[in-house]
Structures are given as structure tokens and as C-alpha cells.
Amino acid sequence: FLPAIAGMAAKFLPKIFCAISKKC
């Protein structure tokens, strides 16, 4: 992956996990 894509994933994945698990 490109560093930019990895950076985006690092930002969005925690938010998605937070929304699914509802543990923010």
C-alpha cells in the first residue's frame, strides 16, 4: 500500500470499529 492509503486506513479503521462496537 502507498503511505497515503495506509494513513487513511489508520484514520478510518478506528472510527469504523468504534461505530460497529459502539465503544468509543
UniProtKB/Swiss-Prot annotation:
Coiled coil: none annotated. It is found in: Secreted. Its main location: secreted. It comes from the Eukaryota. Keywords: Amphibian defense peptide, Antibiotic, Antimicrobial, Disulfide bond, Fungicide, Secreted. GO terms for biological process: defense response to bacterium; defense response to fungus; killing of cells of another organism. Expressed by the skin glands. Disulfide bonds join C18-C24. GO terms for cellular component: extracellular region. Pfam families: Antimicrobial_1. Signal peptide: none annotated. Antibacterial activity against Gram-positive bacterium S.aureus and Gram-negative bacterium E.coli. Has activity against C.albicans. Belongs to the frog skin active peptide (FSAP) family. Brevinin subfamily. This is Brevinin-1Bb. It comes from Lithobates berlandieri.
